[in-house]
Amino acid sequence: MIVCRSHAEIEKLRRVNQLVAQVLAELRQMAAPGVTTAEIDHVAEERVRTAGAEPAFKGYHGYPATVCVSANEQVVHGIPSNRQLV
């Protein structure tokens, strides 16, 4: 099924995608040895909420965080923690 979007809906999608790109660029810069995935998550949530948006993952089926962070041996959907990146 193809969903047709209005111009207003497309504009909202464009704006939120720009926000996501900006946040991901900032998080990419943060990802360095010694930084915890919880710190990355905190910054992501702060940036999203400051922009007037809501984190999509947080609370979805009980997911406790804003981002999914997988590092090293983790495969996917890692829950942010106080574990430092190495």
Model-identified regions with their sequence ranges:
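Active-site neighborhoods and metal-handling regions in enzymes and metal-associated proteins
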Residues: 1-86
